[in-house]
Amino acid sequence: MNILILGSGTSVPLAERASPSIAISLEGHLILMDIGPGTVRQLAVAGLKYQDIDYIVISHFHPDHTADLIHFFFATRYPPVLEERKPFTIVAPKGFDQFLELLKKPYGRWLDLPERLMSTEELKTGENDSREFDGFTIHSAPVNHTPQSLGFRIEDNSGKSITYSGDTGYCEGIVELARDADLLILECSFPDEEAIARALDPIGGG
């Protein structure tokens, strides 16, 4: 399991931090956790190819975690890429299919992909859920941000695990997902002196 933080920022643009996204290489798969603005370019900077992404896992629907879906779909339509692109899966909170249709609507056909190319897996938002994939399992739990927000625990076949959450306040869901995990990655959106209930600060995340 190899992990690369492509972006550790927030909705506020910063020269030194890109928006949230993490690349995980696992069991021969490339998994993207969130896809905030600039993620496709960050992949290129890191020497990774967006066309090699097998799974995109989305924590919630705010723009700083989803905006580069637009770039990703449009870039995937580039004919030399589209001809050789293998199928990929988007794993996201319940309601994602509707969200995606609304996101694509202003662009018309320019974000459309062949049906064979993309599948989606919607996870329950009001309770824990899990999905098994080739070589790993994704467990999810509701977290304290929006009604659709989820935290995740990814476990490979050897038992290694990583827990990830985008924006969240302290909640039992993330505590349980993180229990005995090998690595925990949490978004801490505010400094300690500006802490709010639905987003962690460094002290709250620690």
Named regions from a protein language model:
Residues 1-164, 169, 174-176:
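Binuclear metal-dependent hydrolase catalytic cores
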